[in-house]
Amino acid sequence: MITNRFAITALLLLFALPVTADCPRVPGKEDDRRANAGCLIIQDSKVLLLTHRWGGKLGLPGGTLEAGELAQCTAWRETREEAGLTVTVGERLAVMTNGFHVYRCYPQAPMDTSQAVPVPRSGMTEVSAIGWYELSSLNKEGWRFYYQFEQFLEVAGKAMQSGTAKSQDSASDEPPEK
């Protein structure tokens, strides 16, 4: 009986501890929200999208928040697990109709948008392919959450037109300066 009470008390105290961000974030763009989240990665006027193994539909790298995790760290972790990419997480761009938070993310290594990205071992259960797509090549029927396809296009289009999606001659897309 005492052991069960101790375990329950320990768990409650663990979840009550303050959250620390255990992921790289753009200085000045830190966000303390907790939510399911993902990354919008833009380079050379293309977006990085995953083909989900079950259903074959496209979507952003991202997923479900873990206990005590910040939304920006959820986006970072899920992108690392599903796409094998280490990113720096920037500003929150949108909250989708299903509550999913979309963050602007920047790869920490140069990316070649003319090549598919290999699916990492950690992503193989959920992801069948990773690639770069122009927005004009996408359609609602091929989008995982079809009911928010137009919202995604609007968010990605605005990000491409803003200073957060600067196109560069090099293969890297650096986070904005503070």
Please identify what each model-predicted range represents.
Residues 65-88, 95-148, 176-178:
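Unchanged
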Residues 58-63:
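A short gly/proline-enriched turn/hairpin at secondary-structure junctions
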Residues 20-38:
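Acidic, metal-coordinating catalytic segment for phosphate/diphosphate chemistry
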Residues 46-47:
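Entry beta-strands of beta-propeller and related beta-repeat scaffolds
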Residues 147-178:
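Charged phosphate-binding loop/patch that engages nucleotide di/tri-phosphates or the phosphate backbone
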Residues 1-8:
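Bacterial N-terminal signal peptides that target proteins for export
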Residues 16-18:
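N-terminal signal peptide c-region/cleavage motif recognized by signal peptidases
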